[in-house]
Structure formats: C-alpha cells, structure tokens
Amino acid sequence: MKINVHAGHNPTGKVACGAVGLLDESTENRNVVKELKAILEAEGHIVYDCTCNNGTSVSDVINKIVAKSNANTVDLDISIHFNSGANDKIGNGKSCGTECLIYNTSNNKEVIAKRICANIAQLGFKNRGVKIRTDLSILKETKAPCILAE
C-alpha cells in the first residue's frame, strides 16, 4: 500500500500547536509518525510524511497538510493526534482514550479505523470507537480515504 501519515498541528511553541498538559501533543504525535512510518516501511509499504512544521494559522496548517497529502497518489491517509484528556491524569470522561474519526464509512476506512482503536486500546486506553465527522477539513479534503486517530 501507499500511505500518507502526518502529525496534526504545528510544532510546539508555534501557532496552532497541539494540546499540552500531561503530554505535549505536537511532540508526541511527531514521534508516533516517525515510528509508524518506519514500521509500515519495514512491512513493505510506501509511506509519505505530510506533516506541516511551518503553518501560520490553524487553517494554514490544515491546508498545507491537505496539499502535501493530495500531491501523493495513495491508498490511505492517516492523521495522528492525541486527545487532550482534559489536561489532567483523571480526564473528564469525554476526551480520554482513543478514537478514530472518519468522514464516512466508504473505502474500508471504518474497518481500518476499528482495528486502529482496538490495537491502541490494548495498551490500556479506553476505546471510544469510530466516529463520523463531516466537519473536519482534513477528512473532507484529502483525496485518499482519511482516518484521524486520536
């Protein structure tokens, strides 16, 4: 398979960086992208890192990721994020755990998203499941089927 992967948000310290608290989302999602890319390549997949590190706003970061992603002809697009967990160890019961967001259930996205959630949940995180989100540009505007993993 050919796969795009990207860390959501700008790097830490820049505008539009990710959640901070117990973990720093912008740092950790980049670590995950690096490891995920290496694992997928070791399995024989072609992987493109479409992370944006120089966005000037939230919309600019998203637009740059979408442009990089759409420049590649791939089978799947995966955006890596971390739920904020309400910025504490206990969380608020609403944003804690893992979930995958998809635009719709076509192109086998739901099946893959369920597998991602199940595998992350095996690490001890609450499995919040797969959710349809039609309002997120990253899911709407990428040409390839896209999964946003939280």
Predicted regions and their residues:
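A short, glycine/Asx- and small/polar-enriched loop/turn
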Residues: 72, 141-146
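Catalytic-core regions of hydrolytic enzymes
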Residues: 2-98, 103, 107
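A broad, structure-centric signal for solvent-exposed, well-ordered loop/edge residues
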Residues: 12, 107-109, 137, 146
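Structural motif
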Residues: 76, 128, 145-146
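Active-site-adjacent substrate-binding region
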Residues: 107-131
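Short catalytic/ligand-gating loop segments at beta-alpha or beta-beta junctions
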Residues: 54, 58-59, 122-142
